[in-house]
């Protein structure tokens, strides 16, 4: 399954030729023209919750996709602004968004971003990836998104909140066990 973000309505059709899921970035999650263009491709539309939105506000974004004729919607929790330089995950939002009838994914690594640091570069807390992922599965997230890299320190983007690739298999094994325990 291939997923990619689109940032403008005129990108939807071209991207749809190559991907299975069109993703709407968090900062664009209220852009009607973008949501409608993505919906009209017929592809699954994954809408990332803006850091500035409540989970309940995501119903309006999902409705725009549905009203455009596409019932293939996913929602992604990716943290909420907490002060000026931090994000937090409010796990209540996962079941709240699931109540709309769509799968909800937890974007673990972006939830651990620390934007607007004094150095001008976004920071992160990768040491909390396992904790946040486990909690997300425990509250019933339908999926987990984790950015990985062999060497996050040299990644071209988001390295400050990535999981080292060699740690992924062990983490996924733990998450599967948690999922099995709660079912």
Please tell me what each predicted stretch does:
Residues 151-183:
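C-terminal helical cap(s) of enzyme catalytic domains, especially alpha/beta-barrels
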Residues 6-32, 38-39, 52:
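Glycine-rich anion-binding loops of enzyme active sites
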Residues 6-15, 64-65, 141-144, 148-152, ...:
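Electropositive, surface-exposed helix/loop patches at the edges of structured domains
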Residues 25-26, 87, 110, 154, ...:
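Flexible, active-site-adjacent loop/turn segments at secondary-structure boundaries
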Residues 14-15, 57, 116, 155-156:
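Short Asp/Glu-rich motifs
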Residues 30-148:
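Catalytic alpha/beta core domains of metabolic enzymes, predominantly
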Residues 15, 61, 132, 168-171:
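Hydrophobic side chains in well-ordered alpha-helices
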Residues 1-2:
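Short, small-residue-biased leader/transition segments that mark boundaries at the very start
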